[in-house]
C-alpha cells in the first residue's frame, strides 16, 4: 500500500462556518427604522484559509402629510487570510491528486523548513516544480481586504393630487487591498528569491434622478406627463 494514498485527505483540516446577527427595529406614527449587524466567519478546509465578513445595514422610511422619504445604507467588509490554493493554478488538488505521487506521506513535511535553513529553504522532495503544500499555505499568500458601501435615498412630494415631484439618488463605493507574498525557495509563485507586493483599487459611482410626474383627467381625456433628468458620475 502506498504510504501517501491519503495525502490530500490528511492535508485537509476541519472547516466551519459561523453566522451571527443582531438587529433592532422601531416603528412609529410617521415612519420606521431598522438596523442590522451580521458577522460571518468561514474557516476553510485548507490550512491558513479564513474569511471574515461583516455587514452593517441601516434603513428607514418616514411620511408626513404630502412628503415621503425612504433610504438605506449597507456596509460590507471582507478580509481573507489567503485566497491561494483553489482553481487551476497552484491548486492543492492538482498538486497532490493529479500531478503528485503517493510515494511520500505529506504529514512528514508539516515542518516545512529545512532544519538550520529556516526562512531560506523549504523542506520538500521536489526543488524545481511543486511546493510543499504546508509551505504554500503559509508562505505563498494571496490575502485581500475589501470594503463595499451602498447607499440610496428616495423622496417624493405630492404638490397637488395630480402632480408629484420626486428626487432619488444612490452611491456605490468599493475599496480593495491585495497583498501577495512568497518566501524564498518557492518553486511555483511570484519569485523564487522571495516576493512582496501590495495593490490598492477603489472606485465609486453616483446616480441621481429628479422627476416631475403629472396625471390629470378631464372627463374622458387623460394626460400623463413625466419630465426629469439624470446625473450619473
Residue locations for each model-derived region?
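Surface-exposed loop/interface segments of Gram-negative outer-membrane beta-barrel transport/assembly proteins
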Residues: 1-2, 44-51, 55-148, 166-233
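An active-site-proximal structural segment forming one wall of the substrate-binding cleft
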Residues: 163
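Predominantly transmembrane beta-strands of Gram-negative outer membrane beta-barrel pores used
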Residues: 10-12, 19-41, 57-63, 70-72
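Outer-membrane beta-barrel channels and translocator barrels
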Residues: 17, 28-29, 63-67, 158-160, ...
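A conditional alpha-helix N-cap/helix-loop micro-motif detector
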Residues: 13-15, 146
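Residues on the lipid-exposed face of transmembrane beta-strands in outer-membrane beta-barrel proteins
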Residues: 16, 22-26, 56-62, 151-157, ...
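N-terminal entry motif of extracellular EGF-like repeats
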Residues: 6-7
Amino acid at each position: 500500500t502506498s504510504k501517501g494514498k491519503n495525502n490530500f485527505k490528511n492535508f485537509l483540516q476541519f472547516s466551519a462556518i459561523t453566522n451571527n446577527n443582531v438587529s433592532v427595529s422601531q416603528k412609529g406614527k410617521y415612519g420606521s427604522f431598522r438596523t442590522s449587524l451580521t458577522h460571518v466567519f468561514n474557516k476553510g478546509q485548507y490550512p491558513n484559509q479564513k474569511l471574515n465578513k461583516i455587514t452593517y445595514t441601516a434603513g428607514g422610511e418616514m411620511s408626513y402629510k404630502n412628503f415621503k422619504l425612504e433610504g438605506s445604507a449597507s456596509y460590507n467588509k471582507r478580509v481573507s487570510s489567503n485566497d491561494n490554493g483553489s482553481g487551476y493554478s497552484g491548486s492543492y488538488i492538482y498538486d497532490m491528486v493529479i500531478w503528485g505521487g503517493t510515494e511520500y506521506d505529506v504529514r512528514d513535511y508539516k515542518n516545512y523548513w529545512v532544519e538550520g535553513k529556516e526562512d531560506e529553504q523549504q523542506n520538500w522532495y521536489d526543488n524545481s516544480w511543486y511546493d510543499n503544500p504546508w509551505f504554500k499555505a503559509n508562505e505563498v499568500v494571496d490575502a485581500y481586504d475589501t470594503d463595499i458601501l451602498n447607499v440610496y435615498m428616495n423622496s417624493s412630494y405630492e404638490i397637488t393630487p395630480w402632480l408629484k415631484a420626486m428626487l432619488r439618488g444612490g452611491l456605490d463605493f468599493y475599496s480593495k487591498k491585495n497583498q501577495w507574498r512568497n518566501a524564498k525557495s518557492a518553486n511555483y509563485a511570484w519569485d523564487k528569491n522571495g516576493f512582496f507586493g501590495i495593490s490598492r483599487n477603489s472606485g465609486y459611482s453616483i446616480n441621481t434622478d429628479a422627476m416631475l410626474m403629472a396625471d390629470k383627467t378631464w372627463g374622458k381625456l387623460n394626460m400623463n406627463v413625466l419630465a426629469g433628468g439624470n446625473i450619473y458620475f
